Amino acid sequence: MKEKFIALLTFTSSLKNFGIKFIRVAILVVFVWIGGLKYFHYEADGIVPFVANSPFMSFFYAKDAPEYKDHKNPEGAFVPENRAWHEANRTYTFSYGLGALIMSIGILVFLGIFFPKVALVGDTLAIIMTLGTLSFLVTTPEVWVPNLGGDEFGFPLLSGAGRLVIKDIVILAGAVVLLSDSSQRVLKTLKK
């Protein structure tokens, strides 16, 4: 039994390089998919609470934060008045730019499989982006269960939006591992 356990550990201990490449592919898939969704109105509408409440991003929008609450669309719904408001707010223009940025970061991270110097840029940007996303836990009221009369609300009870945001901590951890790997690979070439 001990021999089988040692054989299993020997195999799993050899997965580090595969795991690092797999993280790069996973980030590519998630970032290209999510970035691509930013070109659809329902997704652009959905990020408005995050952007509007962020001190780092709210300047991209034309309208003040509280106004968006009157113009929320259920996913898949088309409400002409709300669409006009989002167009005037620059919701879609910002979302298109954000989508392009997210997809570009995913591609740069993926290219790190082949080009460690490119990976340094992509990995660093992935870290910055996920830190920005995690900042929404502080800036966006919608990440916590609202007080609607029940006894379960507020911190630490994450809403659907909050549960979505908190998962970025896993991407952040992966990006830190990738940055370390890229740095080691670049250092090897510089020491030659």
Segments the model singles out, each with a brief description of its role:
Residues 1-192:
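Membrane-interface extramembranous regions
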